[in-house]
A protein has these predicted regions:
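Extracytoplasmic
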Residues: 8-42, 60-63
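Short hydrophobic/alpha-helical segments at membrane-entry points of transmembrane helices
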Residues: 13, 98-106
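Small-residue-rich segments within alpha-helical transmembrane domains of MFS-like 12-TM solute carriers
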Residues: 21, 25, 110-118, 148
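Residue-level signature of mid-helix packing/kink "hotspots" within the transmembrane helices
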Residues: 25, 52-61, 148
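Juxtamembrane helix-start elements in MFS-like secondary transporters
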Residues: 41-49, 98, 136
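Helix-to-loop junctions at the C-terminal end of transmembrane segments
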Residues: 59-73
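Structural signature of the two symmetry-related core transmembrane helices
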Residues: 76-90
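Cytoplasmic helix-loop-helix junction between adjacent transmembrane helices
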Residues: 105-141
């Protein structure tokens, strides 16, 4: 795996970013089914989407204020955030419609996205210094596709 990262850093990070950011609007992508099965209102979708955004803001501010992204390896934070985000997202399925637990899990997903989106940018710049501009363009493209993936 390490050899693959060294030989092809850009495809590895942009694909990881694609799948990592798919957590962002995963609930929105299945909302019609969720609302029908659980009888959730449209306002619940707004609450759950807001929970993710709030988690992301708190997470990015925490990373900035504490300097965690500079004290620990960006790839480790990215990995841990991706795994924990996937677990929080999967946990949502078990408690969908149970307020406030569902909101807390979506908030946790947002916190984890703070370790995926900005740290992915840090990784792509560090791993591809000779073509950072093009690499960032690929990364932003994957961020956009990743957030649209659930739809």
């Amino acid at each position: 795996m390490i050899g693959l990262l060294r030989r092809y850093p850009l495809p590895v990070i942009v694909l990881a970013q694609l799948f990592g950011t798919s957590l962002w609007f995963s609930i929105n992508g299945v909302w019609l089914s969720l609302s029908g099965e659980l009888g959730l209102a449209e306002s619940d979708l707004g609450r759950l989407t807001l929970s993710v955004q709030a988690g992301f803001i708190v997470g990015t501010l925490t990373l900035a204020v504490t300097g965690l992204a500079d004290r620990f390896g960006a790839s480790r934070i990215f990995l841990v955030s991706s795994v924990l985000g996937a677990l929080a997202n999967a946990g949502f399925v078990l408690v969908a419609g149970v307020f406030p637990v569902d909101s807390l899990l979506r908030f946790a997903t947002g916190l984890c996205l703070a370790g995926i989106y900005p740290l992915g940018m840090k990784l792509v710049i560090a791993w591809t210094p000779n073509y950072a501009g093009a690499a960032l363009a690929w990364l932003v493209g994957m961020l956009t596709l990743g957030t649209a993936l659930p739809h």
